[in-house]
Amino acid sequence: MSTKAKSKKVNKAWLHDHINDPYVKLATREGYRARAAYKLKEIDESLGLVKPGQLVVDLGSTPGAWSQYLRRRMSPEGAAAGELNGTIIALDILPMEPIEGVTFLQGDFREAELLEQVLGVLAGRKADLVVSDMAPNLSGIHSADAARVAHLIELAIDFAQHHLKPEGALVAKLFHGSGYDELVKLFKANFRTVKPFKPKASRDKSSETFLVGMGLKAQETL
């Protein structure tokens, strides 16, 4: 079988699984932009991370499913268009369709220009929660992919160290495989409590998992 034929077969199988995915159907029915909303929902329902009145930063927010979930949880009635009680800042290098009540800033948060905008919205405040669904474009080369995943985790932790309350939490996506244990150690070096979490909404075939770090350790003690 040619490479082109194999690729076509894989794409057809993925499309079949996607169409029949119960979380895809649920997301469509409930108005979420992606099934990823249910991953954060499961983590939140298990650990009670999201509360009305919080300041939350969503890293790698596009297409916006996590911001949508945060928006609904932080509305008194849980409604998509209800009055927002809190602040949600969404960041991504890609564009994102607006979500009422969510402040979206497009760009790289490592760059001074965007960071100034973030600081302007924070207005001297620290975040209660930072969530990161950031993921690199995977190449299939394990060593290269592991390095890319590690880099994004390091960026999320660094952002949390600078902008998260001491008692706050960070939720970040990573993948089982090369470098996973080192990233768990990195989380433990930065947070007092670390919990791994594999939501039911993550596809069975996926190595995707999440780490939740709670209680930020001071930088000088690292």
Swiss-Prot record:
Enzyme Commission (EC) number: 2.1.1.166
Places the protein is found: Cytoplasm
> Which superkingdom heads the taxonomic lineage of this protein's source?
Bacteria
Question: Which reactions does this protein catalyse?
Answer: uridine(2552) in 23S rRNA + S-adenosyl-L-methionine = 2'-O-methyluridine(2552) in 23S rRNA + S-adenosyl-L-homocysteine + H(+)
Q: Which organism is it from?
A: Variovorax paradoxus (strain S110)
Q: Which SUPFAM superfamilies match?
A: S-adenosyl-L-methionine-dependent methyltransferases (SSF53335)
Protein name as it appears in the record: Ribosomal RNA large subunit methyltransferase E
Q: Which residues bind S-adenosyl-L-methionine?
A: G64, W66, D92, D108, D133
Q: What does this protein do?
A: Specifically methylates the uridine in position 2552 of 23S rRNA at the 2'-O position of the ribose in the fully assembled 50S ribosomal subunit.
Q: Which residues are annotated as active site? A: K173 (proton acceptor)
Keywords from the UniProt entry: Cytoplasm, Methyltransferase, rRNA processing, S-adenosyl-L-methionine, Transferase
One GO cellular-component annotation of the UniProt record comes to: cytoplasm
Any one GO MF term held by the record is: rRNA (uridine-2'-O-)-methyltransferase activity
Q: What family does the entry list?
A: Belongs to the class I-like SAM-binding methyltransferase superfamily. RNA methyltransferase RlmE family.
HAMAP family (alphabetical): RNA_methyltr_E
